[in-house]
Amino acid sequence: MTHDRVPHPGGGFNPPEPTDKGGPDYHRFVEGVRRLQDHARAVDAPDDVITMAADRLEELSALLAPFDADEWQSPSGRRMDLPMRGNVLTIPMNAHKTDDGRVEGWARFARFHLGRNGAVHGGSLGMLFDTVLGLTASVLTGSRRQRTAYLKIDYRQIVPIEKELQFDAGVDSEDGRKIFVSARLRDGDTLLTEANALFVRLKPGQP
C-alpha cells in the first residue's frame, strides 16, 4: 500500500483541524488496533488459529482499504476529544504543564513495545521522548511548528513494559530558531532514562 505524499500548502506541522470523523466508536477502533498489536507480539497459538486470524486480518484490511486517505483527511491525530488525538502510533501517555514551567506526565509501554527480556525496545523510547520533548518545546515556548534536529537518549536502567511510568521535561535554552529541551523518565524514585534534544522552528511554508 503506497500513497503519494500530499504536502500541506502552509508547510510542515500545521495545526490539525479538529474533526469528529470516525464517530463515537473511533476510540474503540484505536484501542482495538493497539490490543491487536499486543496480541501479535505475544501470541503462541496453534497453527490453525494463526491461519484463521490471518484470514480475518486480510478481510479487515480489504474492508478498510477503499477508505485510505492522506494525512490531512484521516481522523488520526485530529480527534481532539480522544487521548493523543486518536493517533494510533503514539505511546499511550498523558502530560500537563506544571506551575513551575515544566511538563510532567505518565507513559505506559505495552507488550507491543517489548524488546527482549522484559525491557522496552530502545526505539520505542525514542518515539516517546520525541513526542514528549516536541510537546514540551511547543507548550513552553508557544512555538507551533518545529522539527527534531537531534535526539540523544542515555539508558540508565531497564525500562519495564505494562507499567505506568513518570516523566518530566523542560526547556533548557533558546537560540534564535533553536529550542534545546531535556527530559527524564522514572519509575518512582528510580531514574530509567534521560534525553535531550534540539528542535528547530520552521520558517513559513517550510516542510
Predicted regions and their residues:
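HotDog/MaoC-like acyl-thioester-processing domains
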Residues: M1-E71, V159-I161, D172-P207
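Active-site helix/loop of acyl-thioester processing domains in fatty-acid/polyketide metabolism
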Residues: T98-R102, V120-S143
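Long amphipathic N-terminal alpha/beta scaffold segment
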Residues: I50-V120
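A short secondary-structure junction signal
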Residues: G115-A119, L165, V181
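Hydrophobic core residues within well-ordered beta-strands of beta-rich domains
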Residues: L89, G101-V103, A149, L165, ...
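OB-fold and OB-like beta-barrel modules that bind single-stranded nucleic acids
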Residues: D168-A169
